[in-house]
Amino acid sequence: MEKTLWTWTLLAVFSLLVVKGMSDGLDLADALGDDDDDEPTTKPPKADPGAGGAGGAAVKPTLKPVKPTVKEPAKPKPKQTGLDDFDLADALNPDNDIKGKGKDSGKGDKEVGGGSRDDGTPNSRGSQFSDDDLLDVGNDNSYKPDKGKGGKGGSSSNVGDLDPADDNNYDTMAETGTIAGIVSAVAMALVGAVSSYISYQKKKLCFSIQQSLNADMVKADAPDAVVAQEPQVQQTLLQPPNAEPPTEENAV
């Protein structure tokens, strides 16, 4: 029984020692990896067997020049940028523009904002638009619009390209517009005169009807007085405005 106990005790001690020895070299950080422990991407150049040395083989003479083999250094990996490194100002940097391919790839990329014309004259910066840009466009004689298309206007440089028939058309259109304006003014005046005359006749007719009604009412109320006053009223109407009013002796 004692031997069995000693045996188990020795096994337990031995297992503890083994576990302790294994745990000394165990590190959880090894599972996460480290950039410093990565192997270098560039391999050391191999030794040239033709180089001079005790164990090197002899180089055979050749007529062709031997080009040295030089390996380009490995390009560093681009650093991954997060949202904290995002900056809108990078869009205004001309170095970040994507260049096109071909001989005309750099044409038009003048200053920030690009937009250079085909004549090679660079425009001003996109945020500094000035009057010089408009003057350059006005002095550009390379643009010639197609005949019969677009507007008829043009700068002084294109005056010789105009058709004489166009000037006649302009004069005809101007005369037509003037005549139309005069005719419309006369028509409006006639319409106003006719409407005024009609309104005057309506008022005159209304007054005459009112006077006749008043006279009929007076005759119906006092026929004797009306008969006595009618000659005086007729005489008053026949007299001029400067005449003296009739007296009682002259009244009939």
From Swiss-Prot:
Task: Report the SS bond pairs.
Answer: none
Recorded GO CC terms: anchoring junction; plasma membrane
Give the main location.
membrane
Compositional bias ranges of the Low complexity kind: 57-68
Q: Which UniProt keywords apply?
A: Cell adhesion, Cell junction, Cell membrane, Membrane, Signal, Transmembrane, Transmembrane helix
Q: Which domain of life is it from?
A: Eukaryota
Question: Which intervals of the chain are annotated as region Disordered?
Answer: 30-170
Q: How does it sit in the membrane?
A: Single-pass type I membrane protein
Report the leader peptide range: 1-23
Q: Which residues cross the membrane?
A: 178-198
* Locations listed in the record: Cell membrane; Cell junction
- A GO BP term, please? cell adhesion
Q: From start to end residue, where is composition biased (Basic and acidic residues)?
A: 96-120
Q: What does this protein do?
A: May function as a homophilic adhesion molecule.
Q: What does the similarity note say?
A: Belongs to the CD99 family.
User: By what name is this protein known?
Assistant: CD99 antigen-like protein 2
- Give the originating organism: Danio rerio
Where is the organism placed in the taxonomic lineage, from the top?
Eukaryota, Metazoa, Chordata, Craniata, Vertebrata
